A protein has these predicted regions:
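A short alpha/beta connector and helix-capping loop motif
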Residues: 5, 24-55
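Active-site flanking residues adjacent to catalytic metal/cofactor-binding acidic residues
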Residues: 12, 53, 147
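Short glycine-enriched, charge-decorated loop/helix-capping segments at active-site entrances
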Residues: 22-29, 65-71
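Acidic-leg catalytic submotif of subtilisin-like serine proteases
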Residues: 8-14
Length: 183
């Protein structure tokens, strides 16, 4: 694997409600150690870490009709899980739709940071990671996936999500070891 071209880590929906709360799944818990170690290495190497967090308005966001209340703005469920140790130099981009880019400041933040490659981590490869990757690709970013730091509700969703990202956006999936060496 070649060095990544001006990378940033995008951490998608690693929130209390997705890992231990209303939309919890064991597969979300399973990626916490790998995500933690990847973020630690990225921070040590000066790679920006950006959290793309669901942050819904109760009673307004139509997504809540499909998924029920989750990640409601101002609640503990909308907070980054403590294991990931959100720090002062990290960035947080709240989102009200699946994509971290849709009507948020993510694109301008990445441009101001000089980012050219986004490393996708978090939940879920077939949903929010997929839509964030799609918009990243359409905006001209290179997209790669941290295969040990992403997951989905089921193995089938995870595998199909990775395959879709590869087929549609050329997003190769790499191990933490490979990614850290490429920072």
């Amino acid at each position: 694997m070649e060095k990544l071209n001006h990378p940033a880590i995008l951490v998608v929906d690693m929130l209390n409600d997705f890992v231990t709360g209303s939309l919890a799944c064991d597969r979300g818990k399973a990626i916490v150690p790998a995500t933690t170690s990847l973020l630690k290495a990225a921070r040590e190497k000066g790679v920006p870490v950006i959290f793309c967090n669901d942050c819904h308005l109760k009673g307004i966001d139509f997504e809540l009709k499909l998924w029920g209340d989750h990640a409601i703005k101002g609640t503990p469920g909308a907070e980054v899980i403590p294991e990931l140790e959100l720090c002062d130099k990290d960035y947080v981009v709240p989102k009200r739709r699946y994509s971290g880019f849709f009507q948020t400041d993510l694109d301008i933040l990445l441009k101001e940071l000089g980012v050219q490659t986004v490393v996708i981590t978090g939940l879920h490869t077939h949903m929010c990671c997929r839509h964030t990757s799609a918009d990243a690709y359409m905006l001209g970013y290179d997209v790669v996936v941290a295969k040990e730091a992403t997951n989905a509700f089921t193995e089938e969703d995870y595998v199909n999500g990775l395959a879709y990202l590869k087929t549609c956006y050329g997003a190769d999936a790499y191990s933490n070891e490979e990614l850290i060496a490429a920072f």
